[in-house]
Amino acid sequence: MIKFIRTLGFKKPSNPILGMVLAGEVDSVGKDVKSFKNGDQVYAINIRQFGAYAEYTCWPESVIAKKPSDVSYEEASSFRYGGLIAWYYLKKGNIQSEQNILIYGASGAVGTSAVQLARYYGAKITGVCSTANLEFVRSLGAELVIDYTKEEATKSGEYYDFALDAVGKRKNSNNWSRQDK
């Protein structure tokens, strides 16, 4: 017996194809697309539509960007994810010039974007990362960098106007922020 859900079609798959972040090559474009052509190397994030893990997918022009030629597909696929998450939380935190902020996990995809965006906003940045990434995080714009393998960021006695945990391992980051005092 065949069970029809709708008169004019079949039921959607119960497990849609996953993925909101992609990097690849444009195979074809619609007649109204202005920014891309066949063969363009691109990367994208689409928080409203899954399907990035499919071999082919169709996404709106507004969520796609051209991939720089000196960047791999793997690197490009991480650009928008880290940047979007960092931007969202810094915007939500209403970061202002001269504020003192802490970025825990400053060397990952979200953290590196957060350091650069916070620098753009004019904030004073303390980054927390491992020994291997201290100079890298400093080069992104952090004024102070704490090596979490040697020092606990919460023990410094410093208060921050905003703290971003880009790792997700802190049980309680409220003790870092004036917003919670």
Regions found by a protein language model. Name each.
Residues K37, S62, Q96, L140, ...:
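Structured loop/turn residues at beta-strand edges in well-structured enzyme cores
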Residues K11, M20, A44-G105:
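NAD(P)H dinucleotide-binding glycine-rich loop of Rossmann-like/cofactor-binding domains
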Residues R48, D70, T131-A132, T149-A153:
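Short, acidic/turn-prone active-site loops that include or flank metal/cofactor-
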Residues S35, G111, L134, A153, ...:
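Short, well-ordered alpha-helical microsegments
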Residues K3-R48:
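Glycine-rich beta-strand-centered segment in the early N-terminal region that forms part
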Residues S77-K150:
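Mid-domain Rossmann-like dinucleotide-binding core that forms the NAD(H)/NADP(H) cofactor-binding site
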